[in-house]
Amino acid sequence: MSKDTGLRAITDHVQDLWQLANFSFHTPRSLTKFRQIKSVARNSGAQCFIESGTYKGHTTKRCAPEFQRIVTIEIDEKLAQNAKQFLCNNLNIEVLQGDVIDCLPNILDRDDIQNVLVYLDGHFSGGITGKGEIDEPACDAINILTKYADKLSAFIVDDFREFGKPGFPKKSHLIDACEDFFGDHTKLTVHLDQVIVLRMNV
């Protein structure tokens, strides 16, 4: 990550903090999202990070020191190739090109994938972002995750504000898919435009 990119991320994070302090917060920026991922990882004990929506790989790279293993999924072929080059020096990161709906089962079937934090940020948002069969596959991805709940420590769904817009599931549908994910041990929070689902310790 370049010095200019890092400085811009810090500046954006300061703006987020200022907006929070003035009750005018709307959309968290990259570094703010990373700090939340880091907090969830530490609270849940997650050692493996699965991300859908690699984009340019900046969040992935920031997460590299926080997890033993990272698998990130990008549907757009060019973005995935660029991310592989950007992240090539991070030996604990694997970049996969494909649809999260197809990739998730293959990843979670691996015996060495345990104590996982899944970060669902793989939706079409215009510009160069990739698009699958549906604009926002989060609810479909969560249905897949239910089959592997014993491997998960937590998951996060990003951009909660977008749900209910054309092409996106309703907010209520997303919450319904999340609220009993870990049965009686589910802790669900909506914070900084993200839905966070944690497995509570027994």
Feature-to-residue mapping (PLM):
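A short alpha-helical cap/connector motif
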Residues: 1-117, 123-202
